């Protein structure tokens, strides 16, 4: 066995709940003696009593033997570069002792490196405050943009001098060329005109020295009749200078989307004794946003086959770099992200060795730096059977029903969002299967499993800036002016078949040294996530 998992703030397993993915993986709640994601009991009532007693004594000895454990792993999540895409590299070093000759105290350090890439294209537009940068500036709406800028000078002063020059070019009304200036600068063109037109020019200037070239040409269209091609080009260029002209593509240079990466070291201290497990620690020190995390689990047996599991915890949300490590909004320099989930979970399960059932629910409150607060509700129920079971192997087959609800859709990456999957409703029915076994020598233990099922989620429309009414108001003004298309992320839904496959093994070199590895892959729609981990564990004493 790899030893007990202690709670961490990374993508590694925690005592109660793995982090929710950007699109949820199927719930693989197929319990077994080797792998049991929700802690269901696995009483082997059909084994001889002597074997039960021997195993219980062995477990007690194992729970107090000190050990050192190290692992290295990688987690990769598909998504948009700089936003939902994520590659996590991590290594864990754990030391466990039994200071009071009962229970186990485990100290863990975990270096973590995250890389999300660089926001690009439309992804850059939806990052931070970049949605404020107009996408369509034309002759019909540039004056509305000028008014918005004047009314919100504090926001636009966040631009660099170079960026302000681009914005200034977008909102500047061109100076009209006067008729007097054109005549003075282009005597050859004037000389080619008829006497009547030259007289008309003199009369117009005498009446109003500020008469513009464009108004004169509009009143005297015959001016084009006597010009050469070259002279027509001169007149056309002078008139064009009077017209508003701006390349909207230049506005993209105002967006700021730096590479998204971070690294740090998470620390954790855990203690387990009897039915109680407790841990406390930090998200990686060195991350932009750092949090204290931890939890307590109490899992008493209500009968020989029934277990109650109560959990209170505060955990990091590891869906994305934004939700996990946090980042810096590039215009304001404000820290943003680093979301934690705080709440509790209740699970009840019954397992007679052949058939098991379970059910429970959870409530969490989610908060982060400059991220709108949120609430999460969960419910799950399921059952399983073991159609095949021997002394060294067993097959579990089950069905799982899950429901998930978040108060708000905060799954985006503009300022105020948290970058984590948060649908207003999510339903899943899945059919997990898992096979576990042990070699005759007892040196090998292995698990392989998977699940397939149907999932559906729905999410509400969400404002780009849920924590800042002023910024959201600017966006809505820009929508009214036709400068951008929307100030809200659209509501949406998705349904379909999802799947999961996972496996792992342990190999005992001797009575003190064990190595192992595990891998998993989840997929639903465009979402997929994979992970691989290898470990080595060394007992510091030989079991008697």
Regions found by a protein language model. Give the residues of each.
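Gram-negative and organellar
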Residues: 1-544
């Amino acid at each position: 066995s790899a030893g007990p998992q202690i709670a961490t703030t990374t993508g590694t397993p925690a005592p109660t709940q793995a982090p929710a993915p950007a699109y949820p993986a199927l719930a693989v709640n197929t319990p077994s003696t080797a792998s049991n994601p929700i802690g269901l009991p696995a009483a082997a009532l059909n084994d001889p009593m002597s074997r039960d007693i021997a195993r219980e004594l062995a477990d007690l000895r194992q729970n107090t033997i000190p050990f050192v454990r190290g692992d290295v792993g990688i987690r990769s999540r598909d998504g948009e570069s700089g936003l939902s895409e994520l590659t996590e590299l991590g290594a864990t070093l754990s030391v466990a002792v039994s200071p009071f000759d009962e229970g186990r105290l485990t100290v863990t350090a975990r270096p973590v490196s995250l890389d999300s890439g660089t926001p690009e294209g439309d992804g850059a537009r939806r990052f931070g405050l970049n949605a404020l940068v107009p996408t369509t500036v034309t002759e019909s709406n540039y004056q509305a943009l000028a008014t918005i800028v004047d009314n919100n000078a504090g926001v636009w002063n966040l631009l660099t001098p170079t960026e302000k020059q681009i914005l200034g070019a977008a909102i500047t009304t061109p100076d009209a060329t006067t008729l007097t200036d054109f005549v003075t600068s282009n005597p050859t063109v004037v000389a080619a005109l008829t006497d009547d037109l030259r007289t008309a020019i003199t009369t117009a200037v005498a009446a109003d020295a500020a008469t513009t070239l464009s108004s004169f040409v509009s009143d005297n269209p015959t001016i084009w009749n006597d010009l050469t091609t070259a002279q027509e080009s001169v007149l056309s260029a002078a008139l064009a200078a009077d017209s508003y002209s701006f390349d909207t593509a230049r506005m993209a240079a105002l967006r700021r989307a730096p590479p998204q990466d971070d690294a740090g070291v998470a620390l954790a201290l855990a203690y387990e004794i009897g039915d109680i497990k407790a841990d406390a620690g930090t998200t990686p020190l060195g991350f932009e946003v750092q949090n204290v995390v931890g939890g307590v689990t109490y899992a008493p047996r209500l009968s020989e086959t029934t277990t109650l599991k109560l959990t209170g915890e505060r955990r990091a949300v590891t869906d994305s770099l934004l939700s996990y490590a946090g980042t810096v909004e590039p215009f304001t320099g404000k820290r943003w992200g680093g979301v934690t989930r705080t709440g509790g979970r209740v699970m009840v399960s019954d397992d007679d060795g052949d058939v098991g059932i379970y059910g429970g629910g959870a409530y969490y409150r989610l908060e982060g730096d400059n991220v709108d607060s949120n609430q999460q509700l969960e419910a799950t129920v399921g059952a399983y059977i073991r159609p095949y079971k021997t002394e060294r192997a067993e097959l579990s087959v089950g069905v799982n029903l899950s429901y998930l609800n978040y108060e708000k859709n905060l799954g985006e990456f503009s300022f105020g969002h948290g970058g984590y999957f948060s649908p207003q409703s999510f339903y899943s029915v899945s059919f997990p299967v898992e096979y576990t076994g042990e070699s005759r020598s007892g040196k090998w233990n292995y698990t392989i499993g998977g699940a397939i099922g149907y999932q559906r989620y729905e999410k509400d429309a969400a404002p780009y800036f849920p924590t800042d009414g002023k910024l959201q108001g600017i966006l809505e003004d820009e929508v009214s002016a036709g400068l951008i298309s929307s100030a809200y992320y659209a509501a949406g839904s998705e349904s379909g078949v999802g799947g999961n496959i996972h496996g792992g093994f342990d190999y005992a070199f001797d009575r003190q040294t064990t190595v192992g590895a595990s891998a998993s892959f989840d997929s639903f729609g465009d979402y997929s996530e994979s992970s691989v981990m290898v470990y080595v564990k060394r007992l510091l004493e030989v079991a008697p």
